[in-house]
């Protein structure tokens, strides 16, 4: 067992020794360039999704995550809250079931109010006037009504990364660039 340990130590020492001088080879392995440069590339590849978190790739995920929040906020302003909350939870995942699921509570709650609007003159219309009730039973206008609240919320998630990036960017170049400029000037002189 001791001979194997000694052999492993000698083998490790043999690989850690500098190479004999060859023409065109510096004689040692430059780990800072040959190993760390691919690591820097790999780290940059990993960091790019985080820097563009609020912008390109995760923007699609943010659309899907904001839809339930907005859809739950808009029905709270409606008169019938529980009917809207129950269908919106399964309708979050695909866009196709939103159209069949939305008219079902819309037909039960809004269609009788439209039929009774001539019978009940203003009190039935007043609570529904702030929200566009008449366009809601139409299916092409339903995707537009959730899209309008989503669009103002999309600029809000990118703002904190932008401010943090702006606060980091002025600090880093002020320290790094003058040092490189001075060394370049010294090399030129």
From Swiss-Prot:
Keyword Phosphoprotein: yes
Biased composition (Pro residues): 129-140, 152-161
PTM annotation: A number of other isoforms are produced by carboxy-terminal processing.
Positions where Phosphoserine occurs in the chain: 32
Molecular functions (GO terms): calcium ion binding; identical protein binding; structural constituent of tooth enamel
Coiled coil segments of this chain: none
Alphabetized InterPro entries for the sequence: Amelogenin (IPR004116)
Comp. bias (Low complexity): 92-107, 114-128, 141-151
Keywords, alphabetical: Biomineralization, Extracellular matrix, Phosphoprotein, Repeat, Secreted, Signal
Superkingdom of the source species: Eukaryota
Endpoints of the signal sequence: 1-16
Annotated region described as Disordered, given as residue ranges: 87-167
Subcellular location as annotated: Secreted, Extracellular space, Extracellular matrix
Swiss-Prot/TrEMBL GO biological process terms: enamel mineralization
One Gene Ontology cellular component annotation held by this UniProt entry: supramolecular complex
Family note: Belongs to the amelogenin family.
Described purpose of this protein according to its UniProt entry: Plays a role in the biomineralization of teeth. Seems to regulate the formation of crystallites during the secretory stage of tooth enamel development. Thought to play a major role in the structural organization and mineralization of developing enamel.
Descriptive protein name: Amelogenin
Phylogenetic classification of the source organism: Eukaryota, Metazoa, Chordata, Craniata, Vertebrata
Gene (UniProt): AMEL
């Amino acid at each position: 067992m001791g001979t194997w340990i000694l052999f492993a130590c000698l083998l490790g020492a043999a690989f850690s020794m500098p190479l004999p001088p060859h023409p065109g080879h510096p004689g040692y392995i430059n780990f800072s360039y040959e190993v760390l440069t691919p690591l820097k590339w790999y780290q940059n590849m990993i960091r790019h999704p985080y820097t563009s978190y609020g912008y390109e790739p995760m923007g699609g995920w943010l659309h899907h995550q904001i839809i339930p929040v907005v859809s739950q906020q808009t029905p709270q302003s409606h008169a019938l809250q529980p009917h809207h909350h129950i269908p919106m939870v399964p309708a979050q995942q695909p866009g196709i079931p939103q159209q069949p699921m939305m008219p079902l509570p819309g037909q039960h709650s809004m269609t009788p109010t439209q039929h009774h609007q001539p019978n009940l003159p203003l009190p039935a219309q007043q609570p529904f006037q702030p929200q566009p009730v008449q366009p809601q039973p139409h299916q092409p206008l339903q995707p537009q009504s959730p899209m309008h609240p989503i669009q103002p919320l999309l600029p809000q998630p990118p703002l904190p990364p932008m401010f943090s990036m702006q606060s980091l960017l002025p600090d880093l170049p002020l320290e790094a660039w003058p040092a490189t400029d001075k060394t370049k000037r010294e090399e030129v002189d």
